[in-house]
Amino acid sequence: MSSAPDPPTVKKEPLKEKNFENPGLRGAHTTTLFRAVNPELFIKPNKPVMAFGLVTLSLCVAYIGYLHATQENRKDLYEAIDSEGHRYMRRKTSKWD
């Protein structure tokens, strides 16, 4: 009657999969070609560069809007020359008004 000691209770932790260590595309199995073609999916975002790009893009859109607004105003104007030879801008008028 040999009494074997009771085996110690071992708590088994759930197995961690590799996909859960790195969430998103960084943990996904991809080819080298896919990583080379799409590096922005795997590189940590650079917030100062993103802020600079957002400000630059916003200024470009605002400038295009400004040019569009000034072009609309110039469309109704033409350069007139009076009898003394002075040039000035005059608004086009319709013959029907």
Curated annotation (Swiss-Prot):
Compartmental location: Membrane
GO cellular component: membrane
Topology of this chain in the membrane: Single-pass membrane protein
Region (Disordered): 1-26
Signal peptide extent: none
Residue stretches spanning the membrane: 48-67
Alphabetical UniProt keywords: Membrane, Transmembrane, Transmembrane helix
Bias (Basic and acidic residues): 9-20
Family assignment from sequence similarity: Belongs to the SMIM8 family.
Name under which the protein is recorded: Small integral membrane protein 8
Protein species of origin: Mus musculus
